[in-house]
Curated annotation (Swiss-Prot):
This is Arginine ADP-riboxanase OspC3. The record marks 143, 188, 211, 231 as: Important for catalytic activity. Its EC number is 4.3.99.-. Belongs to the OspC family. It holds the Pfam family Shigella_OspC. GO terms for molecular function: ADP-riboxanase activity; toxin activity. The active site is at residue 326. Changing residue 328 to A: In EH/AA mutant; abolished arginine ADP-riboxanation of host CASP4/CASP11. NAD(+) binds at residues 143-145, 155, 157, 169, 172-173. ADP-riboxanase effector that inhibits host cell pyroptosis. Acts by mediating arginine ADP-riboxanation of host CASP4/CASP11, blocking CASP4/CASP11 autoprocessing. This prevents CASP4 activation and ability to recognize and cleave GSDMD, thereby inhibiting LPS-induced pyroptosis. ADP-riboxanation takes place in two steps: OspC3 first catalyzes ADP-ribosylation of target Arg, and then initiates a deamination to remove one N-omega group.
Length: 484
């Protein structure tokens, strides 16, 4: 097992360069030109299948690199957090992003490696051994979702790409993430230490959150991925009582259970979240773990970490207790090398929010369940599922009346169907279907939330011009509260 000499050398920056292996930014371009020239020169004598595969892979790798450059350009140029930390770059002047953003990622990664090396240098023999174990460990990357993302091929798309393709599904990316770190063109993964003998996955939550009933696991990283030690936006490690494997630590250790809750950050304060490229990520994890162990007053925990025979599961427990590792792949992952593991059943509402048609069809087998499903669709503003259900089942006005009487659906308990059809963010196409097919009365006054209002009141409040125009054309009037 080999440890980079950088961790024990006095000249930190020089050795950072050794760890990173500074590359010629034109190397990929020159290699591509060389391969294209080779193909051109050999065209007269025929091209072997081996050469065709090589050329195809060269083009594929070039495209993958170009896409990654676009994702990083967006993140580093638009994220306000990077600007405040003086880690931003200028937005590309043209439509395409240059590879400069990838070079910037490497520079940022080297910066954070250098920063942590300066904190922990020099290492003891126990620390060197632990670092070597981490550096030589294999990782699994886990993406959880209630969506059905695979059919022999696993396809996971970033939030930004799904938006560009008008794909409607439950989102875990919010406006604050986009504004501050602008990493919404990446696919997110939890990280765990690979152990071929243990049942996968080792963890089922990330940052205390259960992101879905399906775990999609890959054992290969991306040359253009990046890792953070925590959730990139929320870098606070939660208290021990929120951890998935809390009993392991509460039963075995004392002081460390009170030490773990903290912000993980760099030298510029708690908003300074360390970022490591794929090449540096194991080194970054190991050095930051050593820094935490040094500060811990828990002797039992320290001895446990420095056990030379530590097994992969125990190492994973430590790393995902001290940190909450998050790995990010630019824009999209598409692979046939993966495992899909169902962790639990998916509720009907979660299946609807995730646009999981397979699960919906398995659960909605009669009109009674269709009532539930339609109510969940309207409550969650899932127009795609609502229109799908309306096309599959012959809904009548009586069905709508029965929906409103359901006492086991919170949306129907709190709201009239007319309110759900016209609330802020509702899709006017669904409203159009209901009115055109006589399923609701255009001027029925709400009996539950906002009692006395009508659908036109809701549309006016949200300033939905399409919905307002459609309602007015169908004779809609305002409710009593707005009458003069």
């Amino acid at each position: 097992m080999k440890i980079p000499e950088a961790v024990n050398h006095i000249n930190v920056q020089n050795n950072i360069d050794l760890v990173d292996g500074k590359t010629n930014p034109n190397k990929a371009t020159k290699a591509l030109q060389k391969n294209i020239l080779r193909v051109t020169n050999s065209s007269s004598s025929g091209i072997s299948e081996k050469h065709l595969d090589h050329c195809a892979n060269t083009v594929k790798n070039f495209l993958r690199k170009s896409i990654a450059a676009q994702s990083y350009s967006k993140m580093f140029s638009q994220g306000t957090s990077f600007k405040s930390l003086n880690l931003s770059i200028e937005a590309p002047s043209g439509a395409r992003s240059s590879f400069r953003s990838l070079e910037h990622l490497d520079k940022v990664s080297r910066h954070y490696i250098s920063e942590i090396i300066q904190k922990v240098h020099p290492l003891s023999s126990d620390e060197r051994l632990l670092l070597s174990i981490i550096i030589n460990s294999n990782f699994n990357f886990r993406h959880q979702s209630n969506s059905n993302l695979s059919n022999n091929i696993l396809n996971i798309k970033s939030f930004d790409k799904m938006q560009s393709e008008n794909i409607q599904t439950h989102k875990n990316t919010y406006s604050e993430d986009i504004k501050e770190i602008s990493n919404h063109d990446f696919v997110f993964f939890g990280v765990e230490i690979s152990n071929h003998q243990e049942k996968l996955p080792l963890n089922k939550t990330h940052h205390t959150v259960d992101f879905g009933a399906n775990a999609y696991i890959i054992d290969h990283d991306s040359p253009y991925g990046y890792m953070t030690l925590t959730d990139h936006f929320d870098n606070a490690i939660p208290p021990v009582f929120y951890h998935e494997h809390q009993s392991f630590f509460l039963d075995n250790f004392k002081e460390v259970v009170d030490e773990v809750s903290r912000y993980v950050h760099g030298n510029q304060g708690k908003t300074d979240v360390p970022i490591f490229n794929t090449k540096d990520m194991r080194l970054g994890i190991g050095l930051h773990l050593i820094d935490f162990i040094r500060k811990s007053k828990d002797q039992g925990f320290r001895e446990f970490c420095y056990n030379k025979n530590i097994d992969p599961v125990s190492l994973d427990r430590i790393i995902n207790f001290v940190f909450q590792l998050e790995y990010h792949i630019p824009r999209m992952l598409s692979t046939d090398n993966f495992k899909k593991i169902k962790l639990r059943d998916i509720s009907l509402e979660d299946a609807i929010k995730a646009s999981n048609y397979e699960e919906i069809n398995n659960k909605v087998t009669d009109k009674k369940m269709a009532h539930q499903a339609l109510a969940y669709s309207l409550g969650n503003k899932k127009a795609d599922i609502a229109l799908y259900l309306l096309s599959k089942f012959n809904f009548t006005k009586q069905d709508v009346a029965e929906m409103e009487k359901m006492n086991n659906n919170r949306y129907c308990n709190l709201y009239d169907v007319e309110y759900l059809l016209s609330k802020d963010g509702a899709n006017y196409k669904v409203l159009e279907y209901f009115i055109n097919n006589g399923l609701v009365d255009v001027n029925k006054k709400f009996q539950k939330a906002n009692s006395g209002d009508t659908m036109l009141d809701n549309a006016m409040k949200s300033k939905d011009s399409k919905m307002i125009d459609f309602l007015l054309k169908n004779g809609a009037i305002l409710g009593k509260r707005f009458e003069i």
